[in-house]
Amino acid sequence: MQSSADPDFRQVPAAITIRHAVRVRSPDIFMRILSLACALALGITSFTSSAATAPTAAKVPGSEAIVSKTLPNGLQIIVWPDHDIPNANFYTFYKVGSRNEYPGITGLAHFFEHMMFNGTSRRAPGEFDRIMEASGGSNNASTSNDRTVYTDWFPSSALETIFDLEADRIAHLAFDDKVIESERGVVYSERRSSVDNQPFGSLIEQMQATAFTAHPYQFPTIGYPSDIERWTKADLQQFFKTYYAPNNAVLVIAGDVQPAQVFAMADKYLAPIARQPAPREITTIEPEQHGERRLLLERPDAQTPIVAFAYHSGTNEGGKDTPALALLNTILAQGVSSRLHQRLVEKEQAAVDAGAFVENGYNPGLLWVYAALPPGGDSAKAEAMLDDELAKLVRDGVSNAEMEKARNLKLSAFWRGMATINGKAQALGDYQTFYGDYKKLFDAPAAYAAVTAADVQALAQKILRKSNRTVGWVVPTPQATARKEANP
């Protein structure tokens, strides 16, 4: 859900870079699951990492060269020329995710990550990748509750080749029966590895389904097993026609390109693709929660207990509380000096990892707080510590020093993103899709500076209520625990 405003809002650990190396295309939520699993295995103690002090300058060099254009078919294009190195990228943001699904077709948005690389009426399955790699490029894709994003990186000399490839798969995607069945099996296997056979993945899925009772954020991005088994070709074709339309997409290109060159190629390759009727709007509003919800998963494959709290955030991405929520999350969880790490990991040694992350999107999402216990850890003690630490923040607020550190971390993340063409493309797409205007990206430093300690405390008081949360535990089954104790 949350692909935030600032490029570092969802702190991405080093382990996740494996995704690009091995070409794993997975929903965003499962990348966090992977990172937690790696943290437990390797002794890493946080999803987040400290950053250097941010520069005070707010003007991004080169931003004055950004040019945008909307084609007659509704495709929005943003170009940020950056000639430091002879590379460019091609980021396509489709406004479709699991929030656009319903029982019977859950997981379709993610399924298209696979289909989009498996042939067109002009090209065989796998040819997209072969041509791109022969041109010196690489690619990836990701699906969240709100969007599906396709990312290409390549030498700028290959720009027209990329335009041809991308236009072809939008205009002429193949729906071959054998490919559909093959990829259905791949996705089902992916679900087993990231959810069904992953205790934390199962916990996250069931907590989302418990926290959201009306809004489609309750559906897992990967899809439910029975739906994965039963999608029809007609389902796929209708979904693609509805959501993979130029008027439902934003294209961002950053790097060693000229806007006139980009727009000429867009007119040649993308403008002929017909717009489609606007997708049905999601108007459902999740009812206010009036009592704590709890669930317990007992799993024989759970190595250690894990607890998570999921609080309704009360704000969509780009809402007025977004900067304050980002700073609250940072104070709670970013770095070894953060409140949760210091209390549960360093001081009390009640957890091997403790942290938080935010999932917001077009609609209000969740603030997640979690702790992973050591083998044999005291679950009641760990939950009580989390409650106590959150209650302190609500009651006493945050210090000026914490605010300064949090602002510096967010600003430093902002400027790191602005230092690369991929960071620029991601941020422009995030702001255009979630905020409605990419120019608001450059207001981010001032937005963080404007948040006060009182703002953060007021937001904490608003959302960190037991009646506003779902609590979930995943623990080893008693039989599994007994076996471990008998065979240490």
Question: What do the predicted segments below correspond to?
Answer:
Residues 1-31:
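N-terminal secretory signal peptides that target proteins for export/translocation
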Residues 53-67, 168, 190, 194, ...:
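Histidine-acidic residue clusters that define the catalytic metal-binding segment
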Residues 108-116, 328:
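Active-site His/Glu-centered metal-binding helix of metallohydrolases
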Residues 118-123, 170-178, 398-399:
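Short, polar/flexible loop-turn hinges at active-site or ligand-entry regions and domain interfaces
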Residues 32-39:
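Sec-dependent signal peptide recognition
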Residues 80, 85-103, 107-111, 125-170, ...:
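M16 family metallopeptidases and their MPP-like homologs
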Residues 192, 209, 278-337:
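His/Glu-based metal-binding/catalytic segments typifying zinc-dependent metallopeptidases
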Residues 41-78, 258-298, 306, 443-488:
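Proteolytic maturation boundary segments
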